[in-house]
Amino acid sequence: MFEIFKILFKERYKDPTLQLMLPVILVGYVFIPAFLEKGNFEPYSLVVAYIPLINLSETVTFSLALRNIIFVLGDHLTNGSIVSFLMMPIKRIRFFAYSYILDVVLPYLFWLISNTFYLLDINMINSLTITLMLSYTAGYFFSTSVILFYTLLLRSNGASTLASLFTLGSIFIVGGFGNYTLIESNSSFLALTSFMNPYPIILAYSFDPSYALLNYLIDGVIIDGFLAITLFFTSLIIFYRIEV
């Protein structure tokens, strides 16, 4: 069974993927010290430095997972080459698990390990950075679960890409504006909408680290986690029943 795992690994991380990806993830943390002011991290600046698209490491990690899911696994489904893999001596559930580990979990581990070592090196492990890491983790697995679901459901690279980016973009943008409005009105509905875009709440939390805002962030992480798990098992059922 390990031989099949090696085949899948080489397919997804053949040269020069790792040689390019790992240095970019490491260099991406240059944006964090770029927000230094008077030799110290301003909390709100640290939050801005961790927002996806600004934080290059997070963006590259997510992009790699998207590429693996849609343009490797999804491509096999689109052109029918998945049949050759399913004819190997491996159960569908194990094949799905191997693919998920390589497509989603491994890029996340690259980010998590490098980010943790970086924060330890600059002595910045605190409640704010832990909150940022938890929020990104929950959002990452929710987002990749959405992409995986669309990839297996639509079985078209173009349609999966458009559906995934439209869904995630809409959630992130609407959630950003919505959460900002709810913060201003001090509404308890933040507990339900915080999962859509936690960064306005984290930014507000960096200015005023109150327990109420922290509770909203925790609620968002829990909702993201629940949705990610639900979509994961839904995708597993779709893959298990898929006819090739």
Where are these regions (language model features)?
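Aromatic- and glycine-rich beta-strand/loop motifs that create alpha-glucan
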Residues: 1-23, 241-244
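Central hydrophobic cores of alpha-helical transmembrane segments
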Residues: 21-28, 159-171, 189-195
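Terminal transmembrane helical anchor/hairpin motif
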Residues: 35-48, 172-241
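Membrane-interfacial helix-loop-helix connectors in multipass membrane proteins
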Residues: 40-43, 116-139
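Long, hydrophobic alpha-helical segments
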Residues: 49-75
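Helix-loop-helix units of permease transmembrane domains in multi-pass membrane transporters
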Residues: 71-105
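Hydrophobic alpha-helical transmembrane segments that constitute the membrane-spanning cores
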Residues: 92-126
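A structural motif at transmembrane helix-loop-helix junctions in multipass membrane proteins
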Residues: 135-179
